Swiss-Prot record:
It is an enzyme of class 3 (hydrolase). It is found in: Mitochondrion. Its EC number is 3.-.-.-. The keyword Mitochondrion applies. Keywords: Hydrolase, Mitochondrion. GO terms for cellular component: mitochondrion. SUPFAM superfamilies: alpha/beta-Hydrolases (SSF53474). Disulfide bonds: none annotated. Belongs to the AB hydrolase superfamily. It comes from the Eukaryota. It comes from Schizosaccharomyces pombe (strain 972 / ATCC 24843) (Fission yeast). This is AB hydrolase superfamily protein C4A8.06c. InterPro entries: AB_hydrolase_3, AB_hydrolase_fold, GDXG_lipolytic_enzyme.
Length: 578
């Protein structure tokens, strides 16, 4: 069995090996690679190898490894701040009102997502230099970390959060999020909104800048729409760093062969475990209790479930030739008009859950994939950052333009879009990368400008900022930034592929992306079907026989939590666990 200690050692060894091999490749082919920086290439290579190697480990092992603290305690002070129950309760009410009765039913109820294994807290982050010299600042960065909705913590993301804190010269307030699959949507959204409501009790909204990276930036879009529609006060400005806003992966760059990114083209995968016992938990909810009760013995139930898993694997194997034929035609799967070669109900019958964060049927919900939000107008001034080498570049460009096109109560969203040449996903997280430093400084200068619109007397402690970004008075600024920080105007909209796709393509499944995802998942499943069957059989046997101990929030009337939450957070009564 693979242990988490092995993951640490093997990752370090692989990283060292990769460092030397990449160094020699750079020296040997410098002229061929002169448009890329060595440290950027190196960082991408190490992260990509880690994400691919981590597939052979259980999701909870990788989560534990990715929760290591990377704080600089010498330069920064981290102070935990519990969030009060009133903020949590008010946040839950706003989410329920936004979802409405149908939405609440769609996501399994109005209470299960209030359950926590530990109290909600956020982190205050301050430079020790400011504390020593009593340099008080009432401006706050509200930072939401990324990690594909299932990895990382505030302290793991500390490297780039600290950089943003220092660059603006403000304090940072960053919530620790509950992670999928143990805590799927809307758990992390509730954490973000609760923390913001708490912050508003001590900080004026015009003194707050929202920042986030990747899935955290996507959460910010969803949160701001909810805040806007709930008539709550909006912050002074927003910085989105490589926002992940389309969990259907419907835009072309996701499958592009020219991506210079560490995000694998096959998506995220991990071996089965007690927290993720079978790849698509929801597909087993279709097995009736009557059918399961035919298997009174745990081993009989295990055998039945293992056979079911094997049948589902075979179903997918039979589907591959059809998908390969469709891929030759550059086809897409449109769930409103499914190709006649496929099951018309493929969205619900496809026996794999593609994202840890939510079921396949919910991927297009606007609070999960904000690119499908009907109206993104009327939001605070927004800086949208991305790299021309990342897989998510199309959705980054698309949502920036949508924000500025949509009109909400007569207002568009003022948008500044900056795409950095050759950069990968969330390049600010990579150390010693020149482009990352440029991006952090430009983000701080934009945030400074936003804050000065409400408080002209504010002076950032960072003397390198002037609070006057280029084209500041324009409603929509579209720039490409070179590796040296030089600006040039982005090409016309009609020359950008993702802005000229038919609207019907948005939210459809690219067959090439699906094939790549299936190929990796089948490899993992083929390694072992007995363990996932045993894990799930233990859970179902306990549930059917009345000795599964559930959190009280899961047992309230009308609650039907996602199975990934159930298997992770319910306990089998110890005296019955034989």
């Amino acid at each position: 069995m693979l242990k988490k200690e092995q993951l640490t050692v093997e990752s370090i060894n692989d990283g060292i090996s990769k460092t030397f091999s990449q160094a020699f490749r750079f020296l040997a082919h410098h002229e061929l690679r002169k448009n890329r920086t060595f440290m950027l290439d190196l960082g991408v290579s190490i992260l990509k190898k880690f994400l691919i190697d981590s597939r052979d480990y259980k999701v909870e092992v990788v989560q534990d490894f990715c929760s290591r603290s990377l704080t600089d305690e010498f330069k920064f002070k981290f102070t935990s701040q519990p969030i009060d129950s009133k903020s949590e309760s008010d946040s839950a009410s706003y989410i329920r009102n936004y979802l409405g009765p149908e939405g609440i039913k769609q996501f399994g109820g109005s209470n299960w997502w209030l359950y926590r294994k530990s109290p909600l807290k956020s982190w205050w982050i301050e430079r020790r230099h400011h504390i020593r010299h009593n340099l008080k600042c009432d401006k706050v960065i509200f930072y939401v970390h990324g990690g594909a909705h299932y990895l990382s913590t505030v302290r793991t993301n500390a490297y780039h959060i600290q950089r943003h804190t220092a660059a603006l010269g403000a304090r940072t307030f960053a919530p620790d999020l509950r992670l999928a699959p143990q805590f799927p949507f809307p758990c992390s959204l509730h954490d973000v909104l609760s923390s913001y409501l708490y912050l508003l009790k001590s900080t004026k909204p015009e003194n707050i800048i929202f920042m986030g990276d990747s899935s955290g930036a996507g959460l910010i879009v969803a949160s701001l729409v909810l805040i806007r529609d709930s008539k709550l006060p909006l912050p002074a400005g927003v910085v989105y760093d490589s926002p992940w806003v389309d969990l259907t992966h419907s835009l072309p760059s996701v499958v592009a062969d020219d991506a210079a990114d560490y995000i694998p083209s096959e998506g995220f995968h991990h071996r089965a475990s007690r927290y993720w016992p079978i790849t698509n938990l929801d597909s087993f909810s279709t097995i009736s209790e009557k059918e399961l009760l035919n298997y009174s013995k745990k081993q009989e139930l295990t055998n039945f479930i293992e056979n079911s898993i094997r049948k589902k694997i075979q179903t997918i194997k039979n589907l591959i030739p059809v998908l390969q034929e469709m891929d030759k035609e550059h086809a897409r799967i449109d769930f409103d008009n499914v190709d006649s070669r496929l099951d018309p109900n493929i969205l619900t019958t496809f026996p794999f859950q593609v994202q840890f964060y939510t079921s396949n049927a919910n991927l297009k919900h606007p609070l999960i994939s904000p690119i499908f939000t009907e109206n993104l107008g009327g939001l605070p001034p927004s800086l949208v950052l991305g790299g021309s080498g990342e897989r998510l570049r199309d959705e980054i460009v698309y949502i920036a333009h949508k924000m500025n096109t949509d009109v909400y109560n007569g207002k568009r969203t003022k948008v500044r879009l900056e795409m950095y040449d050759d950069c990968c996903h969330v390049v600010t997280a990579l150390p010693f990368v020149k482009e990352a430093g440029i991006m952090v400084r430009r983000a701080a200068n934009f945030a400074y400008w936003c804050l000065k619109q409400h408080d002209s007397s504010f002076v950032s402690p960072n003397k390198h900022l002037d609070g006057n970004p280029s084209h500041a008075n324009e409603d929509m600024v579209r720039l490409r930034i070179s590796r040296n920080g030089e600006e040039r105007l982005m090409e016309p909209k009609d020359e950008i592929q993702c802005l000229n796709l038919p609207k019907s393509a948005l939210g459809t499944i690219q067959v090439k992306a699906l094939i790549r995802w299936i190929d990796v998942e089948l490899i993992l499943l083929s390694k072992d079907t007995k363990k996932p069957a045993r894990y799930f059989a233990e859970f179902k046997h306990a549930d059917l026989n009345g000795y599964l101990v559930k959190p009280k929030e899961y047992t309230m009337e009308g609650e039907n939590p996602p199975l990934s939450a159930l298997v992770a957070n319910c306990k089998i009564s110890p005296e019955k666990k034989q």
